[in-house]
Amino acid sequence: SGRNVCVHCMDLPIQKGKEGFIGLRDFSGMILRAFEDAGFIYASRITIWKDPVVEMQRTKALGLLHKQVKKDSTMSRVGIPDYVMIFRKDGERNNPVTNTDLPVDLWQKYASPVWMDIDYGNTLQGFRNGRDDNDEKHICPLQLDTIERLIHLYSNKGDTVFTPFMGIGSEVFQA
């Protein structure tokens, strides 16, 4: 039987050109409601810090530009972190994950509600060469550090880790 479901996500920026206003869509809240409606227990949320300067350079988001703070800071915003939302089904665990090899100092790092040390660039990047002009543009590789921690925390050696949205295969690569 399964144990936990870990969902990597972020809240979604709303663009004025597409929807007529600038804001955020509570995507993490939508995920939470969907899992609770399906009978899962919301167990935890990890916030993954991302550099707002890198986000501003990559997205040119108006709310992150310094000139916007100087012009009208009511339209400014903070950077958008990633989240890992953890859900589980209630019931007996026939094969508990004991983590006897996890030292206290590493557990304290993993137990932090904000993971500040995830290397945002540590991803599988080979997909870029395979892109075609007609390909979908939503490829978003997950950081390998995040996957490594979640596998360590929530699975035993030899367990099958189900990854329904395999994308470029980062979870399989880390497992």
Locations of regions flagged by a protein language model:
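Core catalytic lobe of class I
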Residues: 1-175
